[in-house]
């Protein structure tokens, strides 16, 4: 199962960027209150709706890219997490066509230290922010990740059909062209 991930935050950043759904532009949401940095490129899976009402989150094991970069990926596992708003799962991915990542097929193929580093980040990155918390977290394998992607796609399709969700991609007329007022 391949899918597109839109990167919002490159690996190594403390700045938390988000796609502004109204304009399609990248907005600085905040700088993390803790001295932690994102352990992988972080973004969302296109055409999904997670349990928290946002597109399903994704981490991509890749050299740092840039906000707005679109990467074709495949899931290798998922970090099941609950925060102050409820379920906030993070799908762990690799680029689909990267031969350097071909050996990573499921969560147990990821080095234990790398899993612990990602887990530690998500357990502490909200610690100093008032009203924010991480309640519980655990790793699950590729099949669970793919099942959650399918469920998130269904939630997205149902919400769009009901008219209760707007596509997080570039909004129509988000970048209107400047009208020529020279009279020429």
Where would I find each of the regions flagged by the language model?
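Hydrophobic N-terminal alpha-helices or hydrophobic patches in metabolic proteins across all domains
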Residues: 1-184
């Amino acid at each position: 199962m391949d899918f597109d991930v839109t990167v919002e935050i490159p690996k190594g950043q403390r700045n938390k960027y988000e796609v502004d759904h109204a304009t399609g532009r990248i907005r600085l949401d905040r700088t993390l209150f803790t001295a932690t940095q994102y352990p992988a490129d972080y973004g969302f899976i296109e055409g999904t709706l997670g349990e928290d009402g946002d597109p399903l989150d994704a981490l991509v094991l890749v050299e740092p890219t840039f906000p707005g970069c679109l990467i074709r990926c495949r899931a290798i596992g998922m970090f099941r997490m609950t925060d102050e708003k409820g379920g906030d799962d993070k799908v762990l991915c690799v680029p689909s066509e990267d031969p350097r990542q071909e050996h990573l097929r499921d969560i147990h193929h990821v080095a234990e230290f790398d899993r612990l580093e990602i887990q530690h980040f998500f357990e502490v990155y909200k610690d100093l922010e008032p009203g924010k918390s991480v309640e519980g977290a655990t790793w699950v394998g590729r099949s669970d990740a793919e099942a959650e992607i399918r469920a998130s796609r269904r939630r997205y399709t149902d919400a769009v059909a009901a008219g209760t969700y707007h596509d997080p991609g570039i909004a129509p007329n988000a970048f209107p062209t400047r009208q020529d007022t020279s009279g020429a």
